[in-house]
């Protein structure tokens, strides 16, 4: 077993990356950030969720698996920005409930997720950041990521429920 690791969870714009940065500086933890800017499907996903949900979520599942493996094998203490569990248990479930992800893609994703989940160790501590949807919208606008500006309020709300 590697060193202990902490994970930060929360909705889009809740302040996860900010807290990860603070914890890493304050306590000397190595930060592992969510690969938001690396996702080649993200801009397309926010333009047409139905067409790009599956590919975008598979991208995140793959990258988060790699981050979990890195965190588990680290000899130093690590703080992880978003977990593999949130992607599957919150994002994919919200996409299914909103009928953005069809049954076939949902089942395929869940099957892959369950295999991966059996191979990773849960974080030693999980911190959840809560923020109102109004606050999330303000922070997203302030942050200024072009791909996030058109996130539907209903989608953010479904991720918070």
Language-model features and meaning:
Residues 16:
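Conserved lysine of the Walker
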């Amino acid at each position: 077993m590697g060193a202990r690791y902490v994970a930060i969870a929360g909705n889009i714009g809740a302040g996860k990356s900010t807290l990860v940065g603070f914890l890493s500086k304050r306590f000397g933890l190595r930060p592992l950030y969510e690969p938001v800017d690396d996702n080649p499907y993200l801009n397309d996903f926010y333009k047409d969720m139905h067409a790009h949900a599956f590919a975008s979520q598979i991208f995140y599942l793959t990258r988060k698996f790699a981050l979990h493996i890195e965190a588990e094998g680290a000899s130093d203490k690590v703080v992880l920005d978003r977990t593999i569990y949130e992607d599957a248990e919150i994002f994919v479930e919200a996409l299914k409930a909103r009928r953005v992800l069809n049954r076939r893609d949902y089942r395929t994703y869940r099957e892959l997720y369950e295999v991966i989940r059996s191979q990773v160790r849960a974080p030693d501590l999980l911190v959840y950041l809560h923020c109102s949807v109004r606050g999330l919208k303000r922070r997203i606008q302030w942050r200024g990521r072009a791909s996030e500006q058109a996130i539907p309020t209903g989608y953010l709300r479904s991720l918070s429920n």
